[in-house]
Each structure stands twice: as structure tokens, then as C-alpha cells.
A protein has these predicted regions:
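Conserved nucleotide-sugar donor-binding
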Residues: 2-3, 73-87
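Short aromatic/hydrophobic "clamp" motif used to bind/position activated sugar donors
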Residues: 6
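Active-site acidic Asp-centered loop
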Residues: 9-11, 91
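Acidic metal-phosphate-binding loop of nucleotide-sugar-dependent transferases
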Residues: 13-14, 94
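Conserved donor NDP-sugar-binding/catalytic core segment of glycosyltransferases
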Residues: 14, 18-49, 113, 125
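Short, flexible, basic/aromatic active-site loop/helix in glycosyltransferases
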Residues: 37-38, 52-70, 85
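Acidic donor-binding loop at a coil-to-helix junction in glycosyltransferase catalytic cores
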Residues: 96-103
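Active-site-adjacent helix/loop segment of glycosyltransferases
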Residues: 114-222, 250-296
Length: 401
């Protein structure tokens, strides 16, 4: 490409004649390095593709706010050519997925920004078979596994730590409750937010691969124990496994029931009521299937890491890994013990300034949701960090001359 702006799309995408006009518009009104827009499934896609579009794991934009994005999908994005040259283009190691995420993260590590162009919409044909959907999610999982060594600061364990937010039509975590909006006294609250960020940490647990595999193991072990003298233990294990899997299935069914399908046509010659049942059953099945495909891909990516590419590229910012606690340290803290860490510096460090920088960094990392500062009545700590629903870590700083 020789132009000043390079646009990207996929072979399974249809664009409107005005697409490029809207996509490049942010480049002329702000000093941004890239832009991207939404992708929507076309109405003429097959019925299974419509279900896949309503299943988890599809390509989506991640937004910091209404104008700036953390990530835009590879099927609908554009970048300045000089920025691509400075970044040495896409990383060739990502042959299945993850190339767009890697480029967006490296771009932002340089201090550049990506604009979101909501009018630059493309029609994205989704996978039209279960095998194709499984293969897609397999590739996404493999791409995630290869992203982790290149961007360790973007991960907490195996989970991607997005700084922005995903505005998705999927019911997902919030589908099991009806959120209320604070409208103020007599409706006086201006512009109340309809988005919630306080989802219970256990809300997504039944949809995780650990939960599903644990439930399956308990169920199988329970069946085996029923044929042994340990029938009581078998009944307990069987009940635990059935309860875990039943919870997952119930949530998947609830997701499917909350999915909008009213505008979809009937399937072939099936009656409308039967078509709606097939739509919802397929969406529920895809919700159940997706974590297994992603995990399978992550395992494959971990077992077959890319060759010939270093862990950190020259155009990346130096990785700043998030702190991790070793097992022994975790046990000491769990029983009420303490851990001391110290460092030496050539210049004086103001403890208030140090603590402020630490709390600012923790808040910006999105890994920590709740930080409680000392109110002056607790001399044993300077601030506390919520490490879970019932676990708090207290931190105290001391400066010695």
C-alpha cells in the first residue's frame, strides 16, 4: 500500500459505498493513529450464522469512551501508513487470530490512540456451521495464548485485562437480573448511566471452563462410585456434579431466552414457533460450547508456541508484569501473616507520593475493583485492596533514612 492511510477488512465482509468515507473521517478531525467501526451480521445470513452472531466470542470493538477505542476488530479498521511502518506492521506469528489485538496494543504502548467511527459499519458474515464456529474459537484461544508472552501486562492469569468496555448485544452476565436505574428525586438525576460495572465475581463462574470440567468430573466420579461400596459418597459427588452442570445449562438457556430473535425469519419450512425453538436451543448450545473451544485453543497455543519470534519486540514498551503471589506467600497472608518487601533509592521518596502512585496504578490496571484508603483510625495499614469478595490485603509503607 502506498497511500497515507491503509484500510483493512476481511473476505467475509460486505461494505457500503460510504464505508471508507466514514472510516477515514477521524483522521482529518483529530491526531489519531487508527480508526475502526462496528461489524454487524447481515439479515440474509443463514439461520445458523444468525445464532453464531448471538453467541459469545465474536469480534467486537472495545471502547475507552464514545470516541476512543482500545481495540477494533481486524475486519473493519484503518491506520496511518507511517504508524504501520514505525510498528513494523503486523506480527507474522499470528496466523489465525490475535494480530489485530497485538497491533492495537503495540500502537497504544507508543502513546498513539485509535478512534471509533460508529458510522463506518460493515456487514460481517458469521460462521454458518458448528464446525466453523468451533474452529474460529479454537484459533482465538490459540491467539490469546500467543499474546500473553508478548503482552504480560495485559493479562491476569489466563484472563485478558481490558482497560476499556465492550458494548455487546449479548445478555450474558447481566441477564439473570433486572438492573434498576437511579433517576433521582422526582426524576431529577440527569443522564443516569444504564451500564453496570459491579457484576458479582461469581456471576460468570458457571460459564467458566473450570466450573464445567469440575462438574463433569464430579458427575462421572459419582456414577463410578455408585457401583462401589462408597455409594453415599457417589450420591454426593453425583449431586454436586449435576448441580454444577445444571447451573451452567440453566444460565445458557437463560442467555438464549434473553437473546433478541424476533426479527429473524423462519428456518426453511419449519413453523415459526419451531424455528424460534431451534434458534434459542442453538444459541444456548453455543454458549455452552464456546468455553471448551477457547480452552482447547489456549492449550494448543501453549503446547506449540511460535518459533523464530522473540518474546518482546523492539517496538513494544517494556512489559510491566502484574504482581503475582507465590503459594507460600499466599498461605502466609491467608492465615493472617505479613510479607515484607523493600527497595533502596538514591533520592528521598515521599511516602504519601509513593502511596498515591501505587493506588493510582492499581485503579488504572482494572485488576483491582475496590481500594479502601486509611481514614486515620487504622494505624496498621495505609490502604487495603479487595482481592476477592471476602479477602482483603492490607498495605503499610515505611520510609527509613
Amino acid at each position: 500500500a502506498t497511500g497515507q492511510i491503509v484500510a483493512y477488512t476481511d473476505a467475509d465482509v460486505r461494505v457500503e459505498p460510504e464505508w471508507l468515507t466514514y472510516l477515514v473521517e477521524p483522521f482529518f478531525s483529530s491526531s489519531i493513529a487508527g480508526s475502526g467501526g462496528p461489524n454487524v451480521v447481515p439479515a440474509d445470513d443463514p439461520w445458523l450464522a444468525q445464532c453464531v452472531a448471538r453467541a459469545p466470542g465474536g469480534p467486537s470493538h472495545v471502547l475507552f469512551d464514545d470516541r476512543i477505542a482500545e481495540h477494533v476488530p481486524g475486519c473493519n479498521m484503518a491506520f496511518r501508513r507511517d504508524v504501520l511502518v514505525a510498528l513494523d506492521g503486523f506480527n507474522p506469528v499470528f496466523t489465525k487470530a490475535g494480530d489485530d489485538v497485538d497491533l492495537c496494543w503495540r500502537l497504544q504502548a507508543r502513546g498513539w490512540q485509535i478512534a471509533f467511527a460508529p458510522c463506518a459499519l460493515v456487514w460481517h458474515h458469521h460462521r454458518s456451521s458448528l464446525r466453523a464456529y468451533w474452529t474460529q474459537q479454537l484459533g482465538y484461544g490459540e491467539g490469546e495464548a500467543w499474546l500473553k508472552p508478548l503482552h504480560p501486562e495485559k493479562f491476569v492469569g489466563r484472563r485478558v485485562l481490558w482497560q476499556g468496555h465492550i458494548y455487546s448485544p449479548l445478555p450474558f452476565v447481566r441477564s439473570l437480573r433486572h438492573a434498576k436505574i437511579n433517576v433521582g428525586v422526582w426524576g431529577s438525576a440527569a443522564f443516569p448511566s444504564i451500564y453496570r460495572f459491579d457484576a458479582h465475581p461469581f456471576a460468570h463462574l458457571p460459564h467458566s471452563i473450570r466450573w464445567q470440567l469440575s462438574g463433569l468430573v464430579f458427575f462421572i466420579v459419582g456414577l463410578v462410585l455408585l457401583w462401589t461400596p462408597y455409594r453415599a459418597a457417589g450420591v454426593i459427588a453425583l449431586a454436586a456434579g449435576a448441580g454444577a452442570l445444571g447451573t451452567t445449562l440453566a444460565k445458557c438457556i437463560k442467555y438464549a431466552l434473553d437473546t433478541e430473535i424476533d426479527g429473524l425469519p423462519s428456518i426453511a419450512r419449519l413453523p415459526r414457533i419451531v424455528s424460534r425453538f431451534v434458534y434459542r436451543w442453538t444459541v444456548a448450545w453455543l454458549h455452552f460450547l464456546q468455553p471448551f473451544a477457547r480452552t482447547h485453543g489456549r492449550v494448543l497455543g501453549f503446547l506449540s508456541p511460535p518459533r523464530g519470534v522473540s518474546g518482546v519486540r523492539d517496538d513494544q514498551a517494556a512489559p510491566v508484569p502484574l504482581p503475582r503471589l507465590q503459594l507460600w506467600t499466599t498461605l502466609r497472608l491467608f492465615v493472617g501473616g505479613s510479607v515484607q518487601d523493600q527497595f533502596w533509592g538514591e533520592s528521598w521518596v515521599n511516602p504519601d507520593e509513593l502511596l498515591q502512585k501505587m493506588t493510582d496504578w492499581l485503579r488504572s490496571s482494572r485488576a483491582i475493583h475496590i481500594i479502601e484508603l486509611d481514614d486515620g483510625w487504622r494505624p496498621h495499614r495505609d490502604f487495603s485492596v479487595a482481592a476477592g469478595r471476602w479477602v482483603w490485603l492490607d498495605l503499610r509503607a515505611l520510609v527509613e533514612e
